[in-house]
Design a protein with these regions (language model features):
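Cytosolic-side membrane-entry/anchor segment at the start of a transmembrane helix
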Residues: 1-33
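Cytoplasmic juxtamembrane regions at transmembrane-helix boundaries
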Residues: 7, 82-105, 175-181
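Alpha-helical membrane-spanning segments of integral membrane proteins, especially the hydrophobic core
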Residues: 12-20, 56-72, 100-117, 144-156
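Hydrophobic alpha-helical membrane-insertion segments
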Residues: 20-36, 107-124
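Juxtamembrane "helix exit" motif at the C-terminal ends of alpha-helical transmembrane segments
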Residues: 29-48, 123-134
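Perimembrane loop-to-helix junctions flanking transmembrane segments
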Residues: 43-60
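Transmembrane alpha-helical segments in integral membrane proteins
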Residues: 69-91, 158-172
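Alpha-helical transmembrane segments of multi-pass integral membrane proteins
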Residues: 116-181
Length: 181
C-alpha cells in the first residue's frame, strides 16, 4: 500500500508557512528586546505587558531589565510553539503524514500552545507588579486575570495535543497493518 502524501500545493504552503513561523519568532524576539531597551518605547512595552492604561508606573533601569527578563519568558514559550510548528510543517511538506513522529510533533505543538496560555497570565501579573512596585504606598498593583483569548488558546492547545496523540496512535496501527500484509 503506497504511503499517503500531501499534494504539491499543500507541500509548498507548508514550506512557506514554516518559513513564516521562523521569521515570526525571530521578529517577536527582536521586537521584545527593542520595546524594553529603546527608552521611548519602554513605557508602551511596560503598559502593554502589564495590561495597564493610565495607572502610574515607575520605570527604573532595574525594572526595565526585570521586565525584559519576564517578557522574555513569554517570548521563549511563544518561540518554542513556533519552532515546533515549523518542524511539524517541514515534516508535512516532506510528505511524512501518517507517521508516529508527525503525531508526536503535533502533540508537542499543542503542549507548547498550552504552555504559552499558562505563562501569559503569570508574566502579565509579574510585569504589573514590577512596573508599579516603585509607586507611592498603596499604588502597587498586581493583576492576575485570564482573558477569553487565553482560555481559547488553552482549549486549542489541548485539542491539538489530543489530535496529535490520536495521529501517533493511528500511525502505529498503520505500521502494524503494513507488517501483517
Amino acid at each position: 500500500m503506497p504511503e499517503p502524501s500531501i499534494p504539491p500545493l499543500n507541500a509548498r504552503l507548508c514550506r512557506r508557512v514554516s518559513a513564516l513561523t521562523l521569521l515570526s519568532g525571530l521578529t517577536f524576539f527582536v521586537a521584545n528586546l527593542a520595546l524594553w531597551l529603546v527608552p521611548r518605547w519602554t513605557d508602551t512595552a511596560a503598559r502593554l505587558q502589564a495590561n495597564l492604561q493610565a495607572e502610574p508606573i515607575a520605570l527604573t533601569p532595574s525594572v526595565q531589565a526585570l521586565g525584559l527578563l519576564v517578557s522574555s519568558l513569554s517570548m521563549a514559550t511563544l518561540f518554542w510553539a513556533l519552532w515546533t510548528a515549523r518542524r511539524l510543517l517541514l515534516r508535512l511538506a516532506a510528505g511524512d503524514v501518517l507517521q508516529h513522529e508527525t503525531g508526536v510533533r503535533l502533540r508537542q505543538f499543542g503542549v507548547a500552545i498550552l504552555a504559552y496560555a499558562g505563562v501569559a497570565p503569570i508574566t502579565t501579573a509579574l510585569t504589573c507588579y514590577l512596573v508599579t512596585m516603585g509607586n507611592p504606598p498603596g499604588q502597587t498593583l498586581i493583576r492576575l486575570g485570564i482573558s477569553d483569548g487565553t482560555l481559547v488558546l488553552a482549549l486549542v492547545g489541548t485539542v491539538i495535543m489530543a489530535i496529535g496523540s490520536v495521529l501517533a496512535e493511528a500511525a502505529e496501527v498503520a505500521d502494524e497493518h503494513r507488517q501483517i500484509i
